[in-house]
Amino acid sequence: MTLELVTESLLTKNQINHQDVFSCLEDFCTHNIDYGDFYFQSRICESWSLENGIIKEGDYHLDQGVGVRAVSGETTGFSYADQISIDAVRKSAHMAKSIFDKKEKIKIKPLLNQEKKFFYDPINPLKTFTSSEKTNLLYKVDHIARKTDNRVVQVNANLSGSYEEILVVSTEGNLATDIRPLVEFSVSVLVEERGRREKGRSGGGSRTNYSFFITQDDCFGENRIDYWTKEAVRIALLNLSSHEAPSGTFPVVLGSGWPGVLLHEAVGHGLEGDFNRRGTSIFTNMIEKKVASELCTIIDDGTMKNQRGSLNIDDEGVPGQCNVLIENGILKKYMQDKLNARLMNTKSTGNGRRESYSHLPMPRMTNTYMIPGKSKLEDIINSVDYGIYAINFSGGQVDITSGQFVFSTSEAYLVKKGKIFSPIRNTTLIGSGLEVMQQISMVGNDLKMDQGMGMCGKDGQNIPVGIGQPSIKLEKLTVGGTV
């Protein structure tokens, strides 16, 4: 079904047919290239913003174009056009191949549509609610936040959605299409008490439509947008009563879900194929070597139903896949796109991703998580005599080459004698990805994915990702605090 819809939208409406595309691909092969591809894309985005009970902004944006890539060895020729027409395709193709020498024209395989599984429905979320229904959701958020506690002095909320169509054709004879919906909600609350102000944030999203936000979640016991609004208030109030964090080296318990961002940054990026091909990752040449505790199995899975990082196909037309990266502490594979896979004599793992038609694809994560273990969270906490329990993070940075990272928490607690003692603030976690993976001594049975707000940046390209993990215990980690 997506083939007909996407072909009609991206090709037929722009007076292009399959034979036109095939002809351009054939002309492409008059130069000395290993392979090449055309990436057609259309993306419609909208967002609505509320500040203190007033709709401050409503934005609607349409972007479409085609990116053309020619690859020979390690060299890539790339050109793109911000319009879709047969002339734009031909000109972009000519520019992309022009850096290579000419050769005798060869025939390419007929374009065949790839069979694929669907991990989200081909729907347009922008059409599921009217404009007034979308803004009323935001007004409701403001009302709920202020009703929850009279110390709330400011409420900011954002609702956004996008509808994306892509079509990929290659000199290998592949033809692949996808329709990608995505919705997201975020809320930030400011509370004040006796002159002290603190913030709390929450939200979520999914590859579905806006009704996702007003549907009850069994884990929450209420609809998602109500829960996330109250959660933002809870975190803000918690920060009002928090104490300064201690500093030193302690056992650290990371909660389930979003704390997996530490693994994403400190470990996940280091397992991307391009860094390892260039020898700039701490995991270079470590396949089949022990890189983590035997309790650790880490997956990158683009096939999870409706998850933010899921892909029916990646941005090179390769079907979404589930890849075991680390199994029982042993490094099994890197995440690969087509280019790096060819240069490393392996296959693409379905991780070729790009921000848009105007960017080149590269190896990127999809939904990355650690599988659950056997320990109960209560037992993990009980095992800590004095340490930190970190439930949420606000930001961080990592050096891919050294694996060194620094992360800041947005919700954390001091643990004493196996009991959660008090909330703490200004907490930073400092360490090395490789060392941290060896420090994992307990893995919980409570795997949870993040709520659907993950955004990953690399080389100036931002893409949606999923992050998850069960609760885990790190035997020791450097904690930066103020006490």
UniProtKB/Swiss-Prot annotation:
Keywords (A to Z) from UniProt: Hydrolase, Metalloprotease, Protease
GO biological process: proteolysis
Superkingdom, taxonomy of origin: Bacteria
The protein's name in its UniProt record: Metalloprotease TldD homolog
Organism: Buchnera aphidicola subsp. Schizaphis graminum (strain Sg)
Function: Probable metalloprotease.
Top-rank EC class of the record's enzyme: hydrolase
Source organism phylogeny: Bacteria, Pseudomonadati, Pseudomonadota, Gammaproteobacteria, Enterobacterales
NCBIfam families: PRK10735.1 (NF008006)
Protein encoded by which gene: tldD
GO terms of molecular function: metallopeptidase activity
GO cellular component, one term: cytosol
Pfam families with a match to the protein in the record: PmbA_TldD_1st (PF01523), PmbA_TldD_2nd (PF19290), PmbA_TldD_3rd (PF19289)
